[in-house]
């Protein structure tokens, strides 16, 4: 089984991935950012490095999905392949930070990849406001994120909402402005109840 967590930068995807993996005994699949050879350069010069970064992410994410499909265990994935193609690349193109030529090339590659893999059994989307995202980004203090522009985060958030509205597969939306699962046990239990309802047909606690 493949469970995937989607959400903007700073929406606590990795935190929830770790907590759910520990609770259910699932195997976590984390987004690798520490060894990305393009990330720091991208945040310094988005237009120059946007295509390189997105192709790098797409390649890694596709490999992850293929690997997950071969496993019998339950995998919970931190970020999805959809977000690269439906959120980040279109946002860069819309901001004039990726050329139309590069964007079309990238999109064709994504479409080919998606014809070869299945969607997650459940997608968990972490919905968040901009102030909450900025607060989380500042709180974790990653050096390469210090130069992220607020208009970049805002553009991503708008595209996330459009994408989720049209998503056609199994979906659970969590409002992380309200549900503070990291710090409040009762909120984490609410998340568990909702997931159990989606996966096992159990009614969540009201």
Name these PLM-found stretches.
Residues 8:
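P-loop (Walker A) phosphate-binding loop of NTP-binding proteins
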């Amino acid at each position: 089984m493949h469970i995937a967590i989607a959400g903007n930068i700073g929406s606590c995807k990795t935190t929830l991935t770790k907590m759910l993996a520990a609770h259910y005994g699932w195997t976590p699949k984390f987004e690798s950012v520490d060894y990305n050879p393009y990330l720091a350069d991208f945040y310094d010069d988005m237009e120059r490095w946007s295509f390189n970064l997105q192709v790098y992410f797409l390649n890694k994410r596709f490999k992850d999905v293929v690997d997950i499909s071969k496993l019998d265990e339950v995998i919970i994935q931190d970020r999805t392949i959809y977000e690269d193609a439906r959120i980040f690349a279109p946002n860069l193109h819309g901001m004039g930070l990726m050329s139309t030529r590069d964007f079309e090339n990238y999109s064709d590659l994504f479409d080919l990849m998606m014809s070869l893999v299945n969607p997650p059994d459940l997608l968990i989307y972490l919905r968040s406001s901009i102030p909450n995202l900025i607060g989380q980004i500042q709180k974790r203090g990653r050096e390469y994120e210090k130069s992220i522009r607020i208009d970049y985060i805002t553009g991503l958030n708008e595209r996330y909402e459009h994408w989720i509205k049209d998503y056609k597969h199994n979906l659970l939306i969590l409002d992380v402005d309200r549900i503070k699962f990291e710090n409040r046990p009762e909120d984490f239990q609410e998340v568990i109840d909702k997931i159990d309802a989606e996966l096992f047909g159990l009614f969540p606690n009201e």
